[in-house]
A protein has these predicted regions:
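Short, surface-exposed loop/strand segments
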Residues: 17-19, 30-38, 43-55
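Core AdoMet radical
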Residues: 15, 35-45, 60-74, 85-103, ...
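N-terminal pre-triad scaffold of radical SAM enzymes
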Residues: 4-32, 62-66, 213-217, 221
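Flexible mid-to-C-terminal extensions adjoining Fe-S/redox cofactors in radical SAM and related proteins
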Residues: 2-14, 34, 229-316
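Short cysteine clusters
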Residues: 24, 28-31, 208, 221, ...
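Generic structural signal for well-ordered alpha-helices
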Residues: 54, 78-81, 104-107, 135-140, ...
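Residue-level signal for mature regions of secreted extracellular proteins and peptides
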Residues: 17, 21-24, 201-203, 248, ...
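Radical SAM enzyme [4Fe-4S]-AdoMet core and its adjacent flexible, acidic
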Residues: 120-239
Length: 316
């Protein structure tokens, strides 16, 4: 098998995301992966290919964050975690709809744990899709066995009171429970603290120069500079299995779709050191509008709508 050259990340990079899958067993009406399109139909790499690709990364102190969709639905999830070089830190974003005993059997507590101001396993709770009592019990069970877990919840404007009830339950159990800003248009209002407010869901499109601080890898191994490109499947920088590493990681690059940016890239948030004021991308040289944005929406139309969760089903 051909040896792949190392991928060396720029010094200013802050985050590595490995989207093992865009699929999920939950059916949240506000899920960003289902704002139209066929994301979940994206080809999945095998576990061996993920291991081969991720192990070429020269990540320094940046953990590889396994996420999705729901990363644990990948049929090779456990072998991927076990196969990543031990000197590379791993974080995990998950809804934790899994067998905790199987998880503990296959992943030692110390493998997804590092010295950081937040949990390495960040669990999401989704109202109407999960039983909060069962989820909190599962989190507590793993914490009591030495795993680094916390709960992160999208602070949906329709569920504010319920979210705080669950938050108090978690805090009473000694579980770290944090709120994440709800992002995007909802009932005629755009939500989220944005560094470039007119970059998201704008009525007009502009050109600009953009520089990212993140390495985003989709389920097929394609590398993207931002979530907007990732979800739209456009402007790939290459593939994690390409013999030659991408030559333009973290460089200033022209972009013709300012106005179609994704909130995850533009929002003001904490960096990996929990210092507030960071955003995933920097933007400069914004032009005057040159076209209307055909993707502008007053309200997100989600392809799921409101459906019951499909828990316990593993994707192929």
């Amino acid at each position: 098998m051909q040896t792949l050259k190392p991928i060396v990340l720029p010094q200013h990079f802050n985050y590595i995301a490995a989207f093992l899958s865009f699929a999920c067993m939950l059916r949240c009406s506000y899920c960003i992966n289902h704002h139209g399109g066929d994301l979940v139909k994206k080809r999945w790499m095998s576990g061996d290919d993920w291991i081969r690709g991720l192990n070429r990364l020269q990540a320094r102190d940046i953990p590889i964050t396994l996420q999705g969709g729901e990363p644990t639905v990948h049929k090779h999830f456990y072998s991927i975690v076990q196969g990543i070089r031990p000197d590379i830190d791993i974080d995990l974003l998950t809804n934790l709809e899994l067998d905790p005993d199987e998880f503990m059997q296959k992943i030692p507590a110390g493998r997804i744990k590092r010295d950081s101001p937040y949990a390495s396993i960040r669990v999401s709770y989704h109202k109407d899709q999960q039983d909060p009592f069962k989820l909190l019990k599962r989190v507590k069970y793993l914490k009591d066995h030495g795993y680094s877990l916390g709960i992160w919840v999208v602070d949906h404007p329709d569920y504010l009171a319920h979210t705080r009830e669950v938050q108090q339950m978690a805090l009473d159990m000694g579980i770290d429970f944090r709120l994440k800003e709800f992002l995007g248009p909802h009932k005629g209002q755009n939500y989220g603290t944005m560094r470039y407010p007119d970059a998201v869901n704008a009525k007009q499109v502009r050109s600009c120069d953009c520089r990212t601080t993140e390495l985003l890898i989709d389920p097929a191994g394609d590398i993207f500079r931002c979530h907007a490109d990732l979800y739209a499947n456009r402007f790939s920088l290459g593939n994690i299995l390409d013999e030659e590493p991408p030559t333009n990681l973290g460089e200033w690059m022209p972009c013709q779709v300012y106005g179609k940016c994704n909130s995850c890239d533009i929002k003001v948030k904490n960096n990996r050191f929990q210092q507030f004021g960071h955003s995933s991308v920097e933007i400069r040289n914004i032009s005057a509008p040159y076209a209307g944005n055909q993707e502008y929406v007053k309200e997100v139309v989600n392809t799921y709508g409101k459906q019951d969760a499909v828990v316990g089903v593993k994707s192929a």
